Design a protein with these regions (language model features):
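Long, contiguous internal "core" modules enriched in hydrophobic/ aromatic residues
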Residues: 1-310
Length: 310
């Protein structure tokens, strides 16, 4: 049964009936109008409600929910800026190493024989080749593609990759042969190409979360990064054989960024991240540091991540 339409005033009354205090009606109404009930309330209320009764905990306010939403918006902006840097780097690296191995003819990146014969490659290759064929021969939404078709009857990969998403680049990396993967991994100082592929897969997923405005701080991926030296150096607790955090959560993306960004880039990113977390905790005490870090998958010593050499 569809839910009935509620005016902003009715939405506020609904929140009050659930036990949520609204200290400033004008500010609440403004947020509901500017952002919407679903993104703010449905997205963040679970951290202030009793899960068994669905009633807000005593003392919870709309301002608490809005503050958490605004923290997450800032976190997404910080993460997305760093993720875009990696996206540019991996796009450039994939195009360069593939062209160095096979040349600049589009016929090469459209040829399945130029890719690995592994299970992972075979899984992604059919859709990858269809997507690359569309970019090379049919896409009319990018003028630079049309120009290369007209002028050269060929769209080299270093042009085509600019029309690919981070997720598509991730799939192409998966499909490459071991020699190309190893050279790309070496660029980033990552010894194991499989580790690089895992980092990129996770970062591509988090890039989508950020770009689509989904709740980030408590997000969990369906794929994980491998165990790294940083997990051990940061003293992350283990539950059985598995690390309790830094595998599928936001901190897994932070670890991947630590490996893939330059030192100066990561230090600048970390400084913004520290300011964001500290700023939220100092301005709103409704969740508390321990609960916030647990939701984000951040270990207690997360700020020491730049102390250790990779």
């Amino acid at each position: 049964m569809p839910k009935e339409f509620l005016t902003y005033q009715q939405q506020m009354e609904k929140l009050r009936r659930s036990g949520l205090a609204i200290e400033d009606e004008e500010a609440c109404c403004g947020a509901l109008a500017d952002i919407g009930y679903f993104p703010v309330v449905n997205g963040y209320q679970s951290f202030f409600r009793d899960p068994s009764t669905r009633v807000y905990r005593e003392g919870a306010t709309f301002g608490d929910i809005l503050a958490l939403y605004e923290f997450d918006v800032e976190l997404r902006e910080i993460m997305l800026d760093a993720l875009l840097k990696v996206e540019v780097k991996i796009r450039s690296a994939v195009a360069y190493e593939f062209c160095a191995a096979y040349g600049e003819s589009q016929s090469k990146y459209l040829d399945a024989r130029c890719y690995a014969a592994s299970k992972g490659s075979k899984r992604v290759l059919p859709k990858l080749l269809n997507m690359l064929d569309y970019i090379a021969n049919k896409d009319t939404s990018h003028e630079y593609l049309a120009y290369y078709r007209r002028a050269y009857k060929n769209v080299p990969l270093w042009v085509a990759v600019n029309a690919m998403t981070f997720g598509q680049i991730s799939k192409m990396l998966t499909a490459l042969r071991d020699n190309e993967k190893a050279r790309i991994a070496k660029r980033f100082g990552v010894g194991n190409p499989k580790e690089l592929s895992s980092f990129i897969r996770v970062l591509a997923l988090y890039r989508n979360v950020c770009a689509h405005g989904e709740r980030l701080f408590s997000h969990r991926c369906h794929v994980e990064i491998p165990d790294t030296a940083l997990h051990a150096k940061l003293g992350i607790e283990k539950i059985g054989p598995d690390y309790a955090c830094g595998k599928v959560d936001v901190f897994s993306a932070v670890i991947a960024l630590r490996y893939l960004l330059r030192d100066d880039e990561f230090k600048a990113f970390k400084a913004k991240l520290v300011r964001c977390v500290n700023g939220y905790l100092s301005s709103d005490e409704s969740i508390g540091e321990e609960r916030l870090l647990e939701a984000m998958g951040f270990p207690a010593e997360w700020k020491k991540i730049t102390r250790y050499k990779l």
